[in-house]
């Protein structure tokens, strides 16, 4: 999702149009990550938390594809496990309500 966001900003296109054009039945896994802004461009560096516009793209992907394996990529400037875990759990907000509550209960146990 971050790759789509970064490309949409650098090449000026609507990221939701891109997501809507992907054949949902072909999606096996979704990757989310943060990025870094360098002057006029954004680089997919996987070294920051996921920003709200990327979560919005993720939300649309989940709406189209349903519950899909999701990987949080964080490859540099890695914070504590607790912070990475909190960031990964944000993905549950975008699951259908019943699935989200079930997953949150399992994680809390």
Language-model-detected regions and their locations in the chain:
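Acidic/histidine-rich catalytic cores of soluble enzymes
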Residues: 1-41
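A short, acidic, amphipathic alpha-helical segment used as a generic capping/interface helix at domain edges
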Residues: 14-21, 49-64
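Short, well-ordered coil/turn segments that N-cap beta-strands
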Residues: 26-28, 65-68
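Catalytic core of soluble alpha/beta enzymes
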Residues: 31-42, 61, 74, 81-85
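Short, glycine/charged-rich beta-strand-loop motifs at protein surfaces that mediate ligand recognition
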Residues: 43-49
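Conserved active-site loop/cleft motifs that coordinate metal ions or position small ligands
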Residues: 69-75
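Extended recognition/assembly regions associated with phosphoester-bond processing machinery
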Residues: 77-82, 107-109
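C-terminal helical cap(s) of enzyme catalytic domains, especially alpha/beta-barrels
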Residues: 81-104
């Amino acid at each position: 999702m971050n790759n789509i966001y970064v490309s949409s900003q650098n090449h000026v296109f609507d990221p939701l149009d891109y997501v809507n054009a992907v054949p949902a039945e072909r999606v096996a896994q979704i990757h989310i990550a943060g990025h870094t802004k360098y002057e006029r461009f954004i680089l997919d560096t996987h070294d920051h938390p996921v920003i709200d516009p990327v979560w919005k793209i993720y939300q649309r992907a989940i709406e189209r594809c349903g519950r899909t394996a999701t990987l949080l990529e964080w490859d540099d400037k890695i914070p504590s496990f607790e912070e990475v875990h909190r960031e990964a759990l944000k993905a549950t907000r975008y699951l259908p309500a019943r699935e989200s509550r079930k997953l949150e209960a399992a994680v809390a146990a």
